[in-house]
């Protein structure tokens, strides 16, 4: 009724499914990637990807390095474990920070790549379909970027990579914005259809 576009990027898997159980309008994930390629809880599992396809929604692949590279995800978990270990030894904040610096020198942060971003896009297309994948860089929410994807000015390089993998111009147009525009139009249509209906508090 409100024409609200529901974004599931910051929710748990249980909440993803709860929303998909009750919504009659398509949803989006504005900045999430494929959990099958990077087991981050903010990424979308294949089972949910299939439900998004049934719902008519779109998963917009993010460029957050830790959501793209499993190596970076593992590195972050290892760094957190080392921080907790140092804190448990009784070190103050400065000592813990110094210890983490030493640890990071011995364990350099891996880098994600543009090719890995393309892998996530391709995986979501393969599981959910070309009509249900988009781009959601999240440049304003990350401390570092992926080489070759520093801003929206670098999107052509990503599209070129996908074109090399066989994506058609029509596929790329859907990815680059047409899919999200379709969802927005459908959400507005559902709002108009339900404008006179009372709220359903049972669900």
Residue ranges and their predicted role:
Residues 150-203:
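Mid-to-C-terminal alpha-helical segments outside catalytic/metal-binding sites
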Residues 11-18, 34-37, 66-69, 141-143:
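Active-site environment of divalent metal-dependent phosphoester hydrolases
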Residues 96-115, 119-122, 169-184:
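C-terminal helical cap
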Residues 16-30, 69, 75-81:
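Surface-exposed loop and adjacent secondary-structure segments within mature catalytic domains
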Residues 61-66, 127-152:
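Short acidic/histidine-rich active-site segments
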Residues 1-28, 41-57, 116-131:
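Histidine/acidic residue-rich metal-binding segments in metalloenzymes
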Residues 45-99:
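Aromatic-lined glycan-binding groove of carbohydrate-active enzymes
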Residues 6-8, 31, 59, 138, ...:
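Conserved, mostly hydrophobic/aromatic
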